[in-house]
């Protein structure tokens, strides 16, 4: 009888119920909200579902993120090994490879002025950097946090790893991916506030056709120019352009399909679950996390506003040929931000089709965010 009693006692002690804290319950509730938003309302489920489930797992069973050196037998938890690939910047670079294989740079090639809108939207990054410094973060931590303003999860993870800011990598990544998912909610009020209905109704001229030669030369030229000026961007820009060269060359169909489908989705699973697993209650529920989340929101709003305002300047300079709404797509949430530009424009005029025009600034924003990350790395002497 004593044996049975001891066995039952041990079993009860091993359950998660005996170890759950109030903080764990809060994070489990947050994970469930994320799952609800992703499944019920379709808020970027490819991102939110794995992130939320990783969040759920680590707050029920913390040892799933146990570091190998902290383990009695030298074996870490499953998601710890996924997370190591984040720290080594492998997964963010592979994400860029997949994004490149899926991206059409045609709108950007056809309208190079889109680069200016993509650059303007990066203002949010530097606003976040100054804000983080003002809040007492170190210069490297501020730089890592600031990339949230570009709404670029992989680049946020990449820079945090390179600057050795692993203590705040989890909150940075969750904030960046959350704001990427919430683009359809955050951006429209800002876009409508800064534009008139007349501006939102502006119809833009159809983009010129882009030749196959231009499409092939673009990733090669961008790689040479950007990586020569900022060699530290090579892992991101290089992989982005390699993926795009796969797509546009037309001679490596199998590589294109693998990079844009199977590999991409495998990496999303690994990246999403490992990012979610960094949000244990002990690591996530603190004032620094709240500051990071707040800074990210402010930075993203600033980036959106800067893009729209620069779009208004271009509208004035071209005598009404540019719809300012496409400026908000300069953040690098591809293709969510471009879809939002299309949606807001269509609300003003259902016959207005802005998607392809917005894709120019959108893909320019991807390059711009990577360049901003490379600039910070160069400033801090990181290779």
What are the residue ranges of the model-derived segments?
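Intrinsically disordered, low-complexity non-transmembrane regions of multi-pass membrane transporters
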Residues: 1-19, 25, 71, 75, ...
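Entry/N-cap segments of selected transmembrane alpha helices
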Residues: 32, 108-129, 280-307, 358-362
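Hydrophobic transmembrane alpha-helices of secondary-active transporters
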Residues: 34, 57, 84-109, 243-246, ...
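Interfacial helix-loop-helix linkers and transmembrane-helix boundary segments
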Residues: 39-48, 66-67, 81-82, 102-117, ...
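Alpha-helical membrane segments and immediately flanking helix-loop junctions
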Residues: 88, 96-102, 117-127, 131, ...
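Alpha-helical transmembrane segments
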Residues: 167-185, 295-303, 326-327
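Membrane-embedded hairpin module used as a gating/binding unit in multi-pass transport
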Residues: 175-251
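Transmembrane helical segments that form the transport core of multi-pass membrane transport proteins
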Residues: 223-310
């Amino acid at each position: 009888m004593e044996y049975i009693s001891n066995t039952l006692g041990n079993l009860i002690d091993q359950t998660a119920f005996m170890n759950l804290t109030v903080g764990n319950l809060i994070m489990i509730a947050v994970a469930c909200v994320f799952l609800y938003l992703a499944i019920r309302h379709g808020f970027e489920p490819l991102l939110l579902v794995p992130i939320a489930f990783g969040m759920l797992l680590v707050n029920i069973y913390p040892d799933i993120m146990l570091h190998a050196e902290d383990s009695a037998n030298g074996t870490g938890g499953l998601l710890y090994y996924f997370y190591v690939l984040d720290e080594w910047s492998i997964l963010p670079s592979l994400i860029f490879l997949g994004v490149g294989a899926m991206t059409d740079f045609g709108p950007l090639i056809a309208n190079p002025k889109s680069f200016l809108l993509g650059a303007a939207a990066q203002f949010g990054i530097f606003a976040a950097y100054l804000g983080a410094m003002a809040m007492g973060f170190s210069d490297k931590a501020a730089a890592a946090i600031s990339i949230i303003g570009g709404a670029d999860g992989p680049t946020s993870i990449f820079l945090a790893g390179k600057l050795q800011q692993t203590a705040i990598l989890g909150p940075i990544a969750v904030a960046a991916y959350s704001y990427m998912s919430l683009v359809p909610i955050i951006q429209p009020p800002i876009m409508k506030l800064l534009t008139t209905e007349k501006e939102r109704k502006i119809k833009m001229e159809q983009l010129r056709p882009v030749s196959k030669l231009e499409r092939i030369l673009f990733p090669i030229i961008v790689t040479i120019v950007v990586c020569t000026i900022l060699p530290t961007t090579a892992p991101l820009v290089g992989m982005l352009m390699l993926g795009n060269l796969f797509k546009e060359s037309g001679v490596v169909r199998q590589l294109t399909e693998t990079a844009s489908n199977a590999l991409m989705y495998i990496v999303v699973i690994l990246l999403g679950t490992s990012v979610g697993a960094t949000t244990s209650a002990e690591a996530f529920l603190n004032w620094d996390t709240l500051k990071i989340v707040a800074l990210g929101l402010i930075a993203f709003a600033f980036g959106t506003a800067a893009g729209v305002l620069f779009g208004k300047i271009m509208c004035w300079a071209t005598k009404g040929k540019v719809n300012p709404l496409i400026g908000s797509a300069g953040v690098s949430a591809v293709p969510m931000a471009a879809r939002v530009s299309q949606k807001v424009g269509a609300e003003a005029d259902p016959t207005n089709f802005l998607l392809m025009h917005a894709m120019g600034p959108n893909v320019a924003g991807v390059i711009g965010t990577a360049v901003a990350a490379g600039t910070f790395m160069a400033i801090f002497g990181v290779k």
